[in-house]
């Protein structure tokens, strides 16, 4: 009996399957390679320092050319001044940002403590002012109110100090050492950290106003003048900057005085050296003038001795 025709099953190759899948997934893939999508460059908010320095170098290199036209030189000089100003502003901005990050947490802690002090003193002042005549007499009440008013004024200056301290200068903390002192006092006094008035815990690190940092007094003055915002932004000349300028001025004047003194000493020494040279020249001239005369005299003396001896010989 003849066998039925049964063709052998042929297994498809893997590349055929992948080709069919690619063709089904991307019908237009055979047209060419896929185009790359270029993302737009991120625009920086502030100029690059390296780019500004490169522009300044290029402009200076161009200005060093002797054959540069006058109008082009004027344009390049203006561009150079603009680039230098931008570079200076960018460096100042970076230094300011660095100082803000460095002292941010310290300022936050001081501001928090100063705010608590102001709120407590305000509550204390309200309690004393609302107290009746049975609690305390009028004289004691007025005395306490005056003391609280002074403490409240100092506390408000402290709060403004923490808020409006110049952002581009090194921050000097007000409460860092005070917390340690309060802990130590509490351990010594057996946990009794308040006096009869209940305001001892609000004391500052510095015992008196005179002991406070120089910037504290600048903040107090700016509170009266209404220029706290300008002080914070560095638009006012603070005590530290003024002191730095005075110190640099003194150093410059001292260097100028030293140079003048050295030049004067050089002048005196040169004049003395000139005088000594003149004296030596005169002595040399005298020696030279005396030399031929002495030689002539010596020759004459020798001739006289010879004549006398010769005469004596011939006479004999």
Swiss-Prot record:
GO CC annotations on file: nucleolus; preribosome, small subunit precursor
GO biological process: maturation of SSU-rRNA from tricistronic rRNA transcript (SSU-rRNA, 5.8S rRNA, LSU-rRNA)
Sequence segments annotated as region (Disordered): 1-44, 237-316
Subcellular localization(s) per the UniProt record: Nucleus, Nucleolus
Coiled-coil parts of chain: 48-98, 139-160
InterPro entries: Efg1, EFG1_rRNA-proc
Residue ranges with Basic residues bias: 33-44
Comp. bias (Basic and acidic residues): 237-265, 275-302
Superkingdom of source: Eukaryota
Alphabetical keyword list: Coiled coil, Nucleus, rRNA processing
Range of residues in the leader sequence: none
A Pfam family reported for this protein in Swiss-Prot or TrEMBL: Efg1
Function text: Involved in rRNA processing.
Similarity comment text for this entry: Belongs to the EFG1 family.
Protein name, as recorded: rRNA-processing protein efg1
């Amino acid at each position: 009996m003849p066998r039925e025709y049964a063709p052998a099953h042929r297994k498809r190759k893997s590349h055929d399957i992948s080709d069919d899948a690619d063709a089904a997934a991307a019908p237009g893939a055979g047209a060419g390679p896929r185009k790359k999508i270029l993302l737009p460059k991120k625009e920086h908010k502030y100029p690059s320092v390296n780019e500004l320095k490169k522009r300044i170098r290029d402009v200076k290199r161009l200005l060093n050319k002797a054959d540069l036209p006058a109008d082009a030189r004027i344009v390049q000089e203006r561009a150079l001044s603009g680039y230098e100003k931008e570079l200076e502003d960018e460096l100042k901005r970076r230094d300011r940002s660095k100082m803000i990050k460095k002292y941010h947490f310290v300022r936050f802690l001081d501001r928090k403590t100063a705010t608590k002090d102001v709120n407590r003193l305000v509550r204390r002042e309200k309690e004393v002012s609302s107290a009746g005549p049975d609690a305390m007499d009028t004289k004691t009440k007025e005395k306490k109110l005056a003391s609280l008013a002074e403490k409240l004024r100092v506390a408000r200056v402290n709060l403004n100090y923490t808020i409006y301290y110049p952002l581009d200068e090194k921050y000097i903390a007000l409460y860092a050492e005070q917390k340690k002192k309060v802990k130590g006092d509490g351990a010594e006094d057996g946990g009794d950290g308040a006096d009869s008035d209940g305001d001892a815990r609000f004391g500052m690190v510095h015992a008196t106003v005179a002991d406070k940092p120089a910037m504290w007094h600048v903040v107090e003055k700016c509170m009266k003048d209404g220029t706290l915002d300008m002080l914070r932004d560095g638009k006012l000349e603070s005590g530290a900057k003024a002191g730095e300028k005075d110190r640099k001025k003194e150093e410059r004047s001292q260097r100028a005085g030293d140079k003048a003194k050295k030049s004067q000493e050089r002048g005196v020494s040169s004049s003395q050296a000139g005088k000594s040279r003149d004296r030596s020249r005169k002595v040399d001239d005298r020696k030279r003038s005396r030399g031929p005369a002495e030689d002539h005299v010596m020759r004459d003396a020798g001739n006289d001795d010879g004549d006398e001896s010769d005469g004596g010989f011939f006479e004999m």
